[in-house]
Amino acid sequence: MASIERNIIKAELKQMREQGCNTQEIEIRILESIDNENCEDSEFISLYEELTSLPVDPSFAFDEPSTLEEIKALRPDARRHFERARNGVPLDSDTLYDCVYGAWLGRAAGCALGKPVEGWPKARIDEYLKEADALPLDNYLPYIKKQMPRIHIPSSRDNIEYMDRDDDMDFTILGLLALEHAGADISARSIANMWISKMPFAKVYTAERAAYRNFTQSIWPPKSAAHRNPFREYIGAQIRADIFGYVAPGLPERAAQLAFTDASISHKKNGIYGEMFVAAMIAAAFITDKAEEIIAAGLGEIPANCRLAGAVRDTLCWCQQESDWEVVWGKIYNHYGHYHTVHTINNAALVVMGVYYGCKDFELGIVSSVRAGWDTDCNGATVGSILGIVFGAKALPHKWVGVLNNRLISAVSGETDNQISDLAQRTVQLIDVIALGPKKTCDRLLEWDSGGMWELETGWGPQCLDFGTGTIEFKNDDFGPYSLTASNFQNPELHFSFSIDKDGWDFEVDFEGSINADILEGLFYPGEIPVHGKKTLP
C-alpha cells in the first residue's frame, strides 16, 4: 500500500503554492518522483516534510495567520455587537424561535436542492435542467434516470419526504451537541472528542477525514489541522459554521470566535476564515435583512487583507453593479474558478452572491447559488440558512420546506432521525447560555507542578489519579497503574490521556473536564463516561 504522503503530495503542492510559497524548485523533484515507479515511500515522506516546511514568500500580497489573536489584529473596523432587535423591535422568544427554525429549514431546503448535483459545473447543471424542461428552475431538481444517481432520488422533485442524510446537516448537529455539552466553554479538543464519539469516520471527507485520522494517532488540535492535510483550505469548516451563528444572534464576534474554535481542528488560513465569515453573517442576519450589512458583518471578523476577503469584496461589488446573477457568476468564475471545486474561497463568493440576490427572494437565493455549480449542496445550505433567518420559518415558501415534513436524517450517533423543530428548540435554549460567555474561572489555581492525588468515581469504577507519579490506577480491578501519556491544565480546563494495554494493543483514553478547587468533573472518551473526583492529597 502506498504511503499517504505519496497519495496526497500533489494536493499539498497546490496548497503550498496557493498559500504563497515558492514551490518551483521542489515541484520538479516531486513530479520526477511521481513519474518514477520505483521511488520509495521514504522519498515521498522526505519531500513532503520539505514541502510543508517552505516559508511564505515575502512577495506574497496577503496576510493570512491562523491564530485567533493574529486574526483579530488584522480585522477591519466593524461593529461586533448588536442589540437583539430588528428594525428597533426587540427579538422576543417567539421571534427568535421562528428565525432559528427558519434557519434549520432553509439550510435543509438549500442542501436538498443542491445535493443531487454536488460537484457539477454550471454548464452541466443547466444542460440537465434543459433536458428535464426545468428552466427556469422554480422547484427541486427532477430525477432523470441514468443521469442522476439513484442515491439522490430522495432529494429530487416529487420524491422528497424528509431531508436525506448529508454531511452538511450532520455537522450542524455535531456542533449543537458540542455546544450542549460545553456551552460557551467549548474547546477544540471537546469538538474533536464529539466527532470521535458521534460521527463515523467513513462519513467525513477531505480535511475532516485528515483531522479525524490525526485524532486516532493522538495528533490533536491545533496540530491536527495541518498534519498530512492538504485540504485545510477546503470548504469543510465553512459548512460547520451555522450552529455557531444560530446561538449568537446579534453577536458576530462571539459567533466568529466559536467558529474559530471549531475550524481550528481541521483547517488553516482561509479555511478558518470561511467558517468565521459565515458564522458572523448568520449572527447579523437576526438583526438586519439588508444583504450589504449581513456581508459586512462577516467581513468584519476576518483579516482585511486575506484572499477570502478580497473575493467577498469583489463579489459584493459585482452584485451591486449587475441585476443578473449569471453575469456575476461569470465574473466569479473568471477570477476565482482556478480554485478546487470544494475550496473555501470560490464557494464563499457564490454564497455572497446567493445572499445578495436572496435577501428579498428566498427562492432566487438558493436557486442561484445551486445553479452556479461547484459545491452545490454546501452553498445552497449556507444561503438557505442565512435567508431562513432573514425571512423566518413562517414566511418560507411551502414548496421548499413543506415537503421536508419537519424531518432530518443524519449519520450522527443518537441523532439519526430528527424533528427539525426539536433541533431548533434545542438551539434556542443555548442562546442565553452563549450570551453569558465562558464561565468564570475558579478562584483557586491548581498547583500544577504538584497536582496531587485524586480519588475518581467513574462509569468504569473507582480510580486513583496521581499527578505526582503521572499514573492512574483502577482500584477494584487491579488494572494499572497506567502512565499518563499527556496532561494539560489551563485553569479551569483539564485534559489528560492514558493507554490501557489490551494484550498487545493500546486502548487510548482521553479525559476532558475542569477543576474547581478540590473538585474534578468531566468525561472519559471514547464513550462519554462520566468522571467525578475529589483531591485527597496536595
Which role does the model predict for each range below?
Residues M1-I45, E49-S59:
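Long, charge-dense tracts
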Residues P76-S93, Y212-I235, A241-A255, A259-G373:
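Accessory "access/gating" subregions that flank catalytic or transport cores
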Residues S155-I191, W195-V204:
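Aromatic-rich carbohydrate-recognition surfaces in CAZymes
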Residues I153-D168, L179, I420-D449:
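C-terminal domain-closing interface element
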